């Protein structure tokens, strides 16, 4: 080793020692909560097993919450951020960009930018906000909290997303885990729309495609952007994926158009007007409940991400589970009664399987393949009341009368909502009334067989309509009596 190399090596060793010393001093001044949170580094394998002792668990939860509330200037990258959701590669360029926020939207508005773990991004509004209106800056799309009592282990840090209220001037924001950056308008209900430019400094570009706006040339340039997560924005649906998956897509247009069609079909079934804001799907290493769950964002596991993009399979087979969870975002208590949350939601799966994927009416899931068996169980004494057994009678109505009466019935609640504070019995009777009138048939006896409240007054009101003869229908369909 020559002198020059020895000198450089010595300088490097000194720098490492100084950095280690500084890190040690910083760690020594951290609160016990911060030290405990940074020592918590769960992975997919092995996961972190949550203490079963209530006091120990409560202490850990409090430490995690405190850690994720640190002021931006105090935030540094968590040691587990590189494992999930990922960090920027060394020497990744940072950019300053201006994005426009629309004041008449309530949900997240995408920026196409990414905050690296532990780094401060400065957000500056171009002008003052209208009175009573605020803007929330969100860093991180993985919003599921894993701090709930039902969790027994963590495969990633239990909180990953942070929110900040934008100030009148430059506002620093930071997240120990980084993430895509979003803006959300708060408090503008009933006020006129507006637009506001936001300047974001020290962010990184993400693979970001907007249907109808991003050109092939632009996509070729941005698909390899350095952020670890990418985003595909449709008219009705926004899809988040690990960037490695997004970069494989030569043209996201057909995929987004297909998902837009799915959301539009579900909107149509309940009579929603043309939407101005999208649903949003985020795959995660670990979610708070189930294999997927509804909400905003709609959450699923990373294992489901390839299914979301397999357009060939989606076009032919659909995806009952995705249709189902999106359906939860469309359900209403006006026509979903106790024990039916996992029943009426499958109207949407059935509808998409038929209208989007071309499946025969009342098919698309193995559990409903044998309708006769379902009906025998549903109308047995005592009845089986599983979600598919309860779905069976609705499949009967759809096969008999088509989708139009059910669609008209669900849509009618948009223009004529159920009476406020009405009882379950009153709401059930109202549903029977609307469905019967739209089907142009008296369905009261059939719904009474299903256990719905059906007062004599309603039966008298519907007696001018031809009665639906369920027994005759079953005989005609070649099914046996229960």
Sequence positions of predicted segments:
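Activation corresponds to long, low-complexity, non-globular regions
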Residues: 28-76, 235-241
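Catalytic cores of extracellular degradative/oxidative enzymes
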Residues: 219-220, 225-400, 408-409
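Beta/coil-rich, acidic/histidine-enriched accessory regions frequently appended to metallopeptidases
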Residues: 28-36, 54, 66-67, 71-74, ...
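Bacterial N-terminal signal peptides
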Residues: 10-20
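Exposed low-complexity, polar/acidic, P/S/T/G-rich flexible segments that act as propeptides
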Residues: 187-232
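Bacterial N-terminal signal peptides that target proteins for export
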Residues: 2-12
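Beta-strand-enriched, solvent-exposed domains that form extended recognition/catalytic surfaces
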Residues: 66-204
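Active-site-proximal alpha-helical
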Residues: 371-459, 467-470
């Amino acid at each position: 080793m020559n002198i020059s190399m020895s000198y450089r090596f010595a300088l490097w060793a000194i720098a490492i020692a100084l950095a280690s010393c500084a890190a040690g001093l910083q760690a020594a001044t951290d609160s016990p909560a911060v030290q405990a949170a940074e020592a918590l580094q769960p992975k997919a394998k092995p996961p972190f097993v949550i203490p079963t002792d209530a006091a120990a668990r409560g202490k850990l939860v409090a430490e995690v919450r405190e850690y994720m509330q640190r002021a931006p200037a105090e935030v540094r990258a968590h040691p587990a951020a590189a494992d999930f959701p990922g960090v920027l590669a060394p020497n990744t360029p940072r950019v300053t960009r201006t994005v426009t926020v629309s004041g008449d939207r309530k949900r997240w508005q995408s920026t196409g930018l990414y905050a690296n773990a532990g780094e401060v991004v400065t957000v500056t509004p171009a002008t003052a906000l209208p009175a009573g209106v605020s803007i929330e800056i969100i860093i991180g799309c993985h919003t599921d909290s894993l701090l709930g009592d039902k969790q027994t282990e963590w495969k990633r840090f239990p909180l990953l997303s942070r929110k900040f209220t934008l100030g009148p001037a430059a506002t620093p924001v930071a997240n120990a885990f980084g993430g895509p950056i979003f803006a959300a308008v708060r408090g503008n209900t009933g006020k006129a729309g507006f637009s506001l430019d936001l300047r974001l400094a020290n962010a990184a570009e993400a693979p970001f495609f907007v249907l109808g706006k991003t050109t092939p040339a632009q996509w070729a340039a941005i698909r390899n952007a350095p952020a670890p997560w990418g985003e595909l924005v449709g008219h009705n649906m926004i899809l988040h994926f690990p960037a490695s998956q997004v970069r494989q897509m030569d043209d996201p247009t057909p995929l987004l158009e297909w998902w837009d069609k799915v959301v539009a079909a579900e909107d149509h079934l309940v009579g929603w007007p043309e939407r101005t804001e999208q649903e949003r799907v985020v795959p995660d290493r670990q979610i708070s409940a189930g294999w997927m769950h509804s909400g905003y964002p709609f959450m699923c596991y990373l294992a489901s991400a390839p299914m979301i993009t397999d357009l060939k399979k989606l076009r032919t087979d659909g995806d009952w589970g995705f249709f189902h969870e999106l359906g939860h975002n469309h359900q209403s208590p006006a026509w979903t009664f106790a024990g039916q949350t996992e029943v009426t939601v499958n109207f949407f799966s059935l509808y998409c399987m038929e209208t989007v994927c071309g499946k025969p009416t009342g098919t698309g899931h193995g559990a409903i393949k044998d309708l006769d068996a379902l009906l025998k169980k549903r109308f047995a004494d005592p009845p089986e009341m599983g979600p598919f057994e309860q779905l069976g009678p609705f499949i009967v109505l759809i096969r008999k009368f088509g989708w139009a009466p059910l669609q008209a019935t669900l849509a009618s609640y948009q223009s004529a909502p159920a009476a406020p504070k009405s009882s379950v019995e009153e709401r059930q009777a109202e549903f029977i009334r609307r469905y019967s009138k739209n089907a142009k048939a008296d369905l009261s006896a059939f719904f009474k067989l299903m256990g719905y409240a059906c007062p004599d007054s309603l039966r008298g009101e519907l007696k001018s309509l031809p009665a639906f003869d369920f027994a005759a229908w079953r005989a005609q369909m070649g099914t046996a009596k229960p």
